Amino acid sequence: MARTKMASETVESKNRALVLEAFDTLFNKRDYASAERFWSPNYIQHSAHIPPGREGLFNLVRSVPETMRYENQLIVADGDYVIAHGRFTGMGRPAAWIAADILRFEDGVFAEHWDVLQDEATQEESKSGLPMFGDKFPR
C-alpha cells in the first residue's frame, strides 16, 4: 500500500510540475515550439472560450496582447488529473480572468482540458469580502 501511494505521489508531483512549466512556456514565454511537447496533437478542448485542439489554443494565445500573463495560486493532482487555480492578466479586458483549469494527462502530455473562467471581482463586487485570488483585491 505504501509503495502504491508513493508512486502515485511521484506521478502527481511530476504532473503538477509539468502543468506549471507548460503554462509558463505557452502563456508567459509564448514559446510555441517548446510548448508543443506538453500538448497532445489529439488534444481535446472542452472550453467554451477556446477553439478545438492544440492549434486552437495556440492560435488563441497568439491573438491576445503580448502583455498577457498567467500566475498560479494553487495546483492539485489526482492520478492523471490536475486542477490549477490561476489568474490571467494583461489581456486588454476590464478585469483579469480567474481560472480553474482541469487537465487530463495521457502518456505524459495533456490529452484533455476543461475550464471555469470568471472575471476577477473587486472588493466592492465581492459578496464574501474576500479576494478570488491571493490575499489582495485587484486595483
Report the location of each language-model feature.
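C-terminal and inter-domain tail/linker signature
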Residues: M1-R139
